[in-house]
Amino acid sequence: MARRKKIYEGKAKILYEGPEPGTIVQYFKDDATAFNAEKRATIDGKGVLNNRLSEFFMTGLNGIGVPTHFIKRLNMREQLVRAVEIIPIEIVVRNTAAGSISKRLGIPEGTALPRPIVEFYYKDDDLGDPIVSEEHIIAFQWASQQDLDDMVALALRVNDFMSGVMLSVGIKLVDFKIEVGRVFEGDYQRLIVADEISPDSCRLWDIKTGEKLDKDVFRRDLGNLADAYTEVAQRLGVLPKNATPMTKPTLIN
């Protein structure tokens, strides 16, 4: 088989040219990073779990009419997705105060926010993905006003879907991050959800105990990250309840 051409490698995924024009193969790695990659580890099985979970969420969104780049899962670590022109903005939706909003605004972690709050972050690792306003986005032409309106609408629909799905299995969706890309169909452009949706990009807390089931387990050294992700996958029915536990993380020197 011919060697595939690598398009891009990020912290958690590798993108390869797809088998058909306009497609990409997205490969999920076992690497975990935090604090702008200052903290690193290899977590056996993490890529498999995120591939399956992102497939689950993207398929669900497609099913309710929220367009995503997901086409199909190819194997345990890879999925076929549509090629998109990524807008260089991360969209964060917050339902409960945690992480940077608690630090910035002095809101105690766990405080329910009066409504979902949408934030924008400029995608630039060298700058630490700084928070930006709509004015910045339009002034620097990262996206148009219409794009922004569509991005917010997409993000809030994702929030409604994800909140309901998680609530049904006893998990609170604290916040999440998505990326959005442009696809061109004839003379028309539309925006679709891209990248991934997984515990890497969400904060997930057990409703009863407050136990963290997301990447904060790794950030804060709260336990075994693969066990937390496996718990989410099992509750959602993505993995059977008797799935083999993942091995413990191995730190990279």
Curated annotation (Swiss-Prot):
Entry superkingdom: Bacteria
Keywords associated with the record: ATP-binding, Ligase, Nucleotide-binding, Purine biosynthesis
EC number: 6.3.2.6
Claim: Nucleotide-binding is one of the keywords in the record: yes
Molecular function terms, GO-annotated: ATP binding; phosphoribosylaminoimidazolesuccinocarboxamide synthase activity
A biological-process GO annotation: 'de novo' IMP biosynthetic process
SUPFAM superfamilies: SAICAR synthase-like
Catalytic activity: 5-amino-1-(5-phospho-D-ribosyl)imidazole-4-carboxylate + L-aspartate + ATP = (2S)-2-[5-amino-1-(5-phospho-beta-D-ribosyl)imidazole-4-carboxamido]succinate + ADP + phosphate + 2 H(+)
Pathway where this protein functions: Purine metabolism; IMP biosynthesis via de novo pathway; 5-amino-1-(5-phospho-D-ribosyl)imidazole-4-carboxamide from 5-amino-1-(5-phospho-D-ribosyl)imidazole-4-carboxylate: step 1/2
Coiled-coil segments on the chain, per record: none
Cellular component, GO, one term: cytosol
A Pfam family this chain is assigned to: SAICAR_synt
NCBIfam families in the cross-refs: purC
Family note: Belongs to the SAICAR synthetase family.
Protein name: Phosphoribosylaminoimidazole-succinocarboxamide synthase
Upper lineage: Bacteria, Pseudomonadati, Pseudomonadota, Alphaproteobacteria, Rhodobacterales
Gene: purC
